[in-house]
Amino acid sequence: MFSSATTEEGGFEASSNSIIDNDYKSYGLELESSYDVSEDLNFRGGFTYTKAEITSGANDGNQPRRQPKLMYNFIPTYKFSQSKNTLGLSFIGQTKAYAQDNNDLVMNGFVIVNAFVEVGITKGLSVNVSGNNLFDTLAITESEEGNITDNAVNYVRARPMPGRSISMALSYKF
């Protein structure tokens, strides 16, 4: 569990050419766990729940920018053929968050699904195939502008998670 109250002295934000001068309070819970169902099957996961609020200024009562209420991960893995090989998935996600402290523009929540398989070829030699963001999910984690103006050209700079990728690696351990 955590709790915090922060007084921000005012920082310059170059992208919006403005001074950020907000006070904040937050509390929440973070939990991680791992469970071996059997010698071959394992579940790992974690989540962070955060209740955060701006407590001063023009945005008093709003949720701070880029702060989802819930972030989570879940990673099942399975070893097969005498534990020489491993198959796994990971689910990484978060709920919606706001682009700016005014809470006008929402960045949608998302779940990114990854998978991997590692196969032992010989003693010390293995091949790993990984797929990241298998469903090519658009996951925005950060954005600069917070308003969309009617009857105007609007530009919003955003930082997405990488799209789908597949990779293969050959490893030798000696």
For every predicted segment, state its role.
Residues 2-17, 59-66, 93, 104-109, ...:
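Flexible, surface-exposed loop regions and adjacent strand-edge segments
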Residues 22, 65, 106, 159-160:
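Aromatic-acidic/polar surface patches that form glycan- and anion
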Residues 26-28, 69-73, 110-114, 155, ...:
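Transmembrane beta-barrel architecture of outer membranes
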Residues 31, 115-118:
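Short, basic/aromatic-rich helical patch in the C-terminal catalytic core of site-specific tyrosine
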Residues 96-97, 119-174:
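C-terminal beta-signal and adjacent terminal beta-strands/loops
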